[in-house]
Regions:
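Motif-centric detector for short Cys/His coordination patterns
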Residues: 1-127, 131
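Active-site environment of non-heme Fe oxygenases that use a 2-His-1-carboxylate facial triad
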Residues: 101, 107-133, 137-143, 148-149, ...
Length: 372
């Protein structure tokens, strides 16, 4: 039950209840502000409602049988509310006008002349300002290359300082990629790797991947990266029905060896509630056989074929040779990666590990706070 008592008194301006449980605030300078009543009660900043030490909420709306306002008042810079039941709240005007959503660098599609940004590994690790710039670039483009990194195994463990803890997956914490006749994955052959992201067979695939080249004496085997989200936005405009199919139809993915198995059945494209792309899950090598009797299978394959043709003929690909001592970092829910054919048997050793995008964004927040 929502009740607002309309009251005028000296020094106060009138507040009128609106439909949908809002109250209209008329500020002395003429600005009007419409505020949800339940929201007002929920965000009361007083120490009885919020833990000052942690800024967590102490009060819970569910403890009130009804919510009603007895009196309200405004000054130039604050709103006062006296709630039925005896509680009072004071809200700074700046708090009521603020967009409280966290602002992060927005992803940007690659320009026609885009090339990955290179940062020095030691500077990235030791210099907070350099790390801040590098992470901002990573959140915009989805790609970062670190140069002059050590070529010792397990160097990727050091990135936890900037990227957060390694995301553990089955198989190996740090994965070794060499040509290996006993390998369980196509990456262990000299074959080219088509565009993909790793572990599509997880319901939540790792969202950041770091690929560290320890040694690269082989010819061929250039690295490839693809701006998957930019491609999908073009596909959404050109083929909206096919795009919707790829958001709706679940696809089975599986990766396994003699000791472990991962399996997920998920759409290739996942959107958030705003319709924005949040995951592009693409791995032709891990995709499993779909049921041909399911009517969705035919429409899925029509859409999948159209998307794949567009991907393989796309100008969204960048090719480069990853040298020993370089680390390629990709936002793997957005950027697909691959590899051209390795032409000879020269020694080539790469290690990769996984991290989480949330933890990278956390590091940006921490670094930005220290440089305000």
């Amino acid at each position: 039950m929502l009740v607002v008592a309309e009251e005028n008194h000296a020094g106060c301006h009138s507040m009128n209840a609106e439909a949908l449980g809002n109250v209209q605030v008329n500020w002395p300078d003429g600005e009007r502000m419409s505020l949800p009543i339940l929201w007002l009660r929920d965000v009361c900043p007083c120490e009885a409602c919020r833990i000052a030490q942690t800024q967590e909420k102490r009060f819970h709306l569910a403890t009130l049988e009804t919510v009603s306002i007895e009196t309200l008042g405004v000054s130039d810079e604050a709103l006062w509310v006296a709630w039925t039941g005896g509680h009072s709240s004071q809200y700074p005007r700046s708090f009521l006008a603020k967009d409280h959503a966290r602002v992060m660098p927005q992803w940007q599609p690659w320009s026609d002349d885009y090339t990955p940004a290179y940062f020095d590994f030691q500077a990235f690790q030791a210099n907070d300002r350099m790390a801040l710039l590098a992470i901002e670039e990573f959140l915009r483009s989805g790609v970062l290359i670190l140069s002059n990194a050590p070529t010792e195994e397990a160097t990727l463990e050091l990135l936890a300082k900037r990227l957060g803890p390694i995301r553990e997956v089955l198989f190996e914490r740090i994965h070794n990629v060499k040509v290996d006749p006993r390998g369980y994955n196509v990456a262990h052959t000299n074959l080219g790797l088509p565009p993909h992201n790793d572990f599509a067979s997880y319901s939540w695939p790792p969202s950041v991947q770091a690929l560290h080249m320890l040694a690269n004496e082989a010819s061929g085997g250039r690295s490839t990266i693809f701006d998957g989200w930019a491609l999908l936005e073009e596909f959404r405009s050109a083929e909206p029905e096919a795009f919707d199919v790829l958001c709706r139809v679940e696809v089975p993915f599986r990766e396994f060896d003699e000791s472990n198995e991962t399996y997920a059945c998920e759409p290739i494209i996942r959107l958030n509630t705003k319709g924005e792309i949040v995951i592009f899950r693409y791995s032709n090598q891990l995709m499993q056989v779909m049921n041909p009797a399911d009517p969705d299978t035919a429409v899925f394959y029509d859409a999948y074929y159209k998307l794949s043709r567009r991907l393989f003929s796309s100008d969204k690909v960048r090719r480069f040779r990853l040298e020993g001592g370089q680390i390629l970092i990709v936002a793997s829910h957005r950027v697909l990666h691959g590899r051209e054919v390795i032409d000879d048997a020269g020694y080539r050793h790469l290690q990769d590990a996984y991290f989480e995008h949330d933890n990278v964004r956390n590091m940006l927040t921490v670094l930005a706070r220290s440089h305000d």
